Curated annotation (Swiss-Prot):
It comes from the Bacteria. Residues 149-183 are annotated as: Disordered. Gene3D superfamilies: SepF-like protein (3.30.110.150). One of its GO terms (cellular component) is cytoplasm. PANTHER family: CELL DIVISION PROTEIN SEPF (PTHR35798:SF1). Cell division protein that is part of the divisome complex and is recruited early to the Z-ring. Probably stimulates Z-ring formation, perhaps through the cross-linking of FtsZ protofilaments. Its function overlaps with FtsA. This is Cell division protein SepF. The lineage of its organism: Bacteria, Bacillati, Cyanobacteriota, Cyanophyceae, Synechococcales. Homodimer. Interacts with FtsZ.
Amino acid sequence: MSIFSRLKKVVAGDDYLDDDYGTELEYEDGLEPSDSTLDRGGAIAPIGSFDDGDPFASSNVIGMPGITSAAAEVLVMEPRSFDEMPKTIQALRERKTIILNLTMMEPDQAQRAVDFVAGGTYAIDGHQERVGESIFLFAPSCVTVTTASSEESAAPSVMAREEEATAPAAPSPAWGTQDAING
């Protein structure tokens, strides 16, 4: 062997190490494809094809019952009698937000209507908010209601200078003094 052939064997490796075993596939010649598995071009079509008319087969999106992807709908209702209140509850069940203007009703009927719709809203875990005089907002659980007045009450208030002078000073805690630590 020449020096070049030895170098070639070392760098390229031996042919018997590079032989791919098991790459030959065994086929059974006894089975012929049936007409149902052949497509128009004569090739074999997959048996469990996802194109069997299922429109959601290629999509990973799973629909949730009762929830639509359409825009949220807000209904403004001005009932004249209590008899119109079941329509309000049905709209809430259909996940629609309701603005209920009760200025057209008598005060006792309006109170009864608000109690009825508030009970229905509570039953579906919805939200209710008073918007104005005899005007109420009822929303299903899928709608978040935030008011500016609740944000203002959560914000710290600034006391006036006169209030600061009259406000009593908070007592210092006993556990924070030096005498309490030394005993």
